[in-house]
Amino acid sequence: AGKNESDPETGNLTGGLEGRDTEVQGKTTRQVMKDLAESRPSLGYAPTRDLPKLTAGDQMGVHYSGQSQISIGARFAYEAARLAGKDTGSVRSGRYDLPLGSPDAWMNRKMPGKNVCVWNVASSVKPSLVSGGVKLFGIRVEDPAVKTVIVRSKGSSGDRLVIGPGGIRLAEGKNLQLRTNVQLAGRQSWNIPGGSAVEIKPSPVQEKAMPVRLSGQAEVHVTQAEGGGETVEAARVVLEQVLPSALKCSWTLSGKVEMTLKGMEGKAVNLGKVFVKQGAVLNLNGSRPVAGSVVNQGGMVNP
């Protein structure tokens, strides 16, 4: 009794749920489960060492049958968090083959409506696809297996991702890459840790990288997330080959935020008003914003 027994399929150890990452045959539990998730697309990915965090405050615990640990998948993690009263939002499922407009692309078919959309340990390691128009109230990247969550066009020039007032929030060490047309809606905050980035980049349309159309009516406040310690790295926003289209927007860059325009050298660019606060940086890289659109309020604007 009390002896740790290894599950031959997942590599999990019974009794190994104390936040430590154990090692099985030279691989950590996390590596074993990541390999398993990648080899079997139908499975979600939820490392056992993350379950105590997901189940904090509830009485579900983890059940055993003799010396074998019951298999715990992404749906268990989702349900545990839901039963614990946590705001799980709409959690991205492991069905990366389905576009975000499909109910099965979300845990328990909980489609985004007024829910913030979450990428976490239950989510796929593969890019998420946008087919047609997809409306998300907001995006929260918590602790997926990958450092960079990619949301990209399925390949049509009409694909479009709408980001609403829920804005964007990234966990420390995580990045978000949007490779599809983007429409911004409402007053929203982008909360980005130092060293992390939100990138809007060319989308693959018929195997060609096409400029991204940026549209909508919004007021975007970009701030560096608190709690990053004494990090000297900026929170970054990168707009690469972006084509504003009927865009009515204002951007407020707070301290320790850096916005960079790429691939638009010599081109006139109308992103709306961009307020560069003290401690913020705007890199134009040769692009030519509309006269009067950049308002420097104590920050740095590099031509």
Question: How would you label these PLM feature ranges?
Answer:
Residues 198, 258-263:
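Right-handed beta-helix
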Residues 1-88:
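Cell-envelope and extracellular/periplasmic
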